[in-house]
Amino acid sequence: LENAVDRAFYERLLSGLGGGEPTRQYEAFLKAEVDFRNATNALRLARSGADIDPAAYFIEGGELFTRGSLARLARNLDELVEHIADSQYGEELGPALRELEEADSLIAFEHATDAALLAYGDRLGTIHPVSITPIISYILAKEREVENIRAIARGKEAGLSTDEIESELVIT
């Protein structure tokens, strides 16, 4: 259900964008967000080993995957990781991909995609300071801050150690 909502949201949002340089920057940000969601979905499917059609989880609008490439790559974790590492996001996600190969957890990768998206939003905000991108960057940073505060509160309530709580935070 969550993926269907994401798919409808991004497809509608991307189809309604106008022209102009600031809009192109916003579109680039949205495409990166779609790429990160598709990468996360593909990695989840590849790691689960479940016999689920990856194309059903594909969100249109990104540049990293096509429906066919996502379906093919989600069946082979090594090829998927290599595809992401060789992409325009390889530099930002490289450390997380290495950790993903070594550890057996997607959490670090998901945190790295969140941090990379925040950093990308910050970069766009400095390129076009009189556009929507600084506002998006600010909203994303505040959203991440609230999520981190919630993680700290839940961790303390559950009696987790400081190290365990810190591993759940996304810090840029």
Where are these regions (language model features)?
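Extended alpha-helical surfaces
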Residues: 1-172
